[in-house]
Amino acid sequence: MGKIIGIDLGTTNSCVAVLEGDEPKVIQNPEGARTTPSVVAFKNGETQVGEVAKRQAITNPNTIQSIKREMGTDYKVDVDGKNYTPQEISAMILQNLKSTAESYLGDKVDKAVITVPAYFNDAERQATKDAGKIAGLEVERIINEPTAAALAYGLDKTEQDEKVLVFDLGGGTFDVSILELGDGVFEVLSTAGDNKLGGDDFDQVIIDYLVEEFKKENGIDLSQDKMALQRLKDAAEKAKKDLSGVSQTQISLPFISAGESGPLHLEITLTRSKFEELSDELVRRTMGPTRQALSDAGLSSNDIDEVILVGGSTRIPAVQEAVKKEVGKEPNKSVNPDEVVAMGAAIQGGVISGDVKDVVLLDVTPLSLGIEIMGGRMNTLIERNTTIPTSKSQVYSTAADNQPAVDIHVLQGERPMASDNKTLGRFSLTDIPPAPRGVPQIEVTFDIDKNGIVNVTAKDLGTNKEQNITIESSSALSDDEIDRMVKDAEQNAEEDKKRREESDLRNEADSLVFQVDKTLKDLGDNVSEDDKKQAEDKKEALKSALEGQDLEDIKTKKEELEKVVQELSMKVYQQAQQGDAAGSNQSDVEDAEYTEVKDDDDKKDNK
């Protein structure tokens, strides 16, 4: 069985890991970094992913960031008249990580475990699975990020029983999970969170502050200038990171705008205390789900043995202090918050492939599931924090005499009224035989699989007629759409590969032309005019080919010039050897004369 890679598909950054022996290993990307920015850019028909896409975000409006926040919605990204779904953009990031893993392993990779925030609903999980499929990956398991982190933390601690609180504050989402670890069993007791809270929001409060200060001073609203906003975003992110280590940082953005008197510059000193004041509301928002998770698990903060911080945003000192104050324990800093989730996913891949033994993962569903009943109320079948996979059935009846069909409105959420919860889907059970109200017996069954994805079945117990659906939200993709996107992704990957090969070939050819010029200059009179002319002719032929689009011609001309350069180098090398040999012989003669003179002197001394 091939390797199953572990992928942390993050809002801001993503990470890929693989199990090597008993240890998960984070794979470096081609730039040598252990995480890859979750950024996709479209430029001149080419798709760019990661650091290269992030670097040109200021000047390229076709740059997409934080797409994870739109997963499970019907949001579309318009790029030069073509619409892309969040699944397609995420697939491009996954494809990049897949390629990184393949380069490292030297083998094809087609299976993965992908992590999602624990608080992701059904639509968001399904969208993540679809993204994997578009990227050419068979998603063996979708697991929750805090659970993955606990796996990585607790793999070598299976002898002792521990209750662990995982506090996961990423770029765009926030989760708290409480797990019990012991004897190789990782059981999630509860989970809570906020899918619209993360590092991006901490950046935003700095951006808002900078915009406000600049407007006060210069009367210009930078939030209306797209390019200025991107520069502010980059500066805010950097300032946030700086303030995790220092008490103040200088934000300097020259030529950010222009006024009547000329160019305007933004120069502001941001202190950690000011940042803490700006972000206080965000930090306090993380405490609600933390208390909720403890309450749902039936635990107090005194029952927690370890606190694990996950996600880059947990490096913010105010966040660490708030967690410490709430739980009453110093957070464990033995895990890397940016990498631990991918490492846990790789371990889960090892569990699935059989490489990791004696580890059992018991996860939970983050939100309650039920259907709408009379009066617009929600009737819950599966409570939140129920261990998955699970199945639950309940019998309902008709609301009117001779009712021929029932509509099943599937809901996810905690509110008593159906309209206040998220609709996962609707379907109908038809052809119910005429009968008085309350007589027909309709059994509704909810199934949640190991990925947290929901199937619902409705069955008329009188006729045994059955209707079922795998929940698909308005954002879900049909098999045909996924197949089309898979083909597009493969085609784009092939085209990108060709573009890269062309770029590499042209760069190598340019470099060779420069090298030939330098070599001929260095050799000077050591090369015959005929050899020089031949090299010059081949060089000009290659330069001419580079102006065209025929790659085969460039390749041929490059090889011809390389051959001439090799022959030149050989001749020069041989000449150098001959020169050394001649010099060596001359040296021997001089030594002999010296010896003879020495003998004469000796004779004189003897006289």
Swiss-Prot record:
List residues modified as Phosphothreonine: T173
Keyword Phosphoprotein set for record: yes
**UniProt keywords, alphabetically:** ATP-binding, Chaperone, Nucleotide-binding, Phosphoprotein, Stress response
The keyword Signal appears for this protein: no
Please note every region of biased composition (Basic and acidic residues): 490-509, 524-542, 595-607
Under Gene Ontology molecular function, one entry of this record is: ATP binding
Name what induces it.
Answer: By stress conditions e.g. heat shock.
Q: Which Pfam families match?
A: HSP70
Composition skew (Polar residues), residue ranges: 574-587
**Chain residue ranges for the region called Disordered:** 490-510, 524-555, 574-607
InterPro entries tied to this protein: ATPase_NBD (IPR043129), Chaperone_DnaK (IPR012725), Heat_shock_70_CS (IPR018181), HSP70_C_sf (IPR029048), HSP70_peptide-bd_sf (IPR029047), Hsp_70_fam (IPR013126)
Q: State the function annotated in the UniProt record.
A: Acts as a chaperone.
Among NCBIfam families, the record links this protein to:
PRK00290.1, prok_dnaK
Give the similarity note.
Answer: Belongs to the heat shock protein 70 family.
What is this protein called in UniProt? Chaperone protein DnaK
